[in-house]
């Protein structure tokens, strides 16, 4: 089964992608991992991507699609894969579908882990990081033994700029702008499945397993 995971930053799609990969023994593929592997191995595609990245430029969609398609043709993907973080836009989705079709392949499911913005802002706003060792906590879900103090090294905990409500909301606005058309695209294709991401992690996963029918 070939699966694409959709969901806003902080919705938990990465966690679910890992759980799917483990249960069905298929690779969990992120574009970041693909970039790092190709650059490390000095592949032609990796070197092209590195040229853009070294200049602080976005890697063009065509090149990202080439990298993804190259990855999903590898032996460990013969029984399927979970794509996490790609595609992000309709042009990327169209290019991916076209490239897969040329190989006689297609995406089976696009699973949207749906969480309201307010929940995500609260989730991410509760994160704390240690100024000393970098350990991460959550005020509600993973609190420290002593409030505001790291369990590991005893240093102070801070709210990172990335987790501040106004920053999170900006990221969510960008996500919705880019991804709502993508959700519409996969709805028209008849492969979009939506799960409630506000419930317990294991309940989210159970809903996904039910969708996948195994």
Q: Positions of the model-derived regions?
A:
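Glycine-rich phosphate-binding loop of ATP-dependent small-molecule kinases
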Residues: 1-214
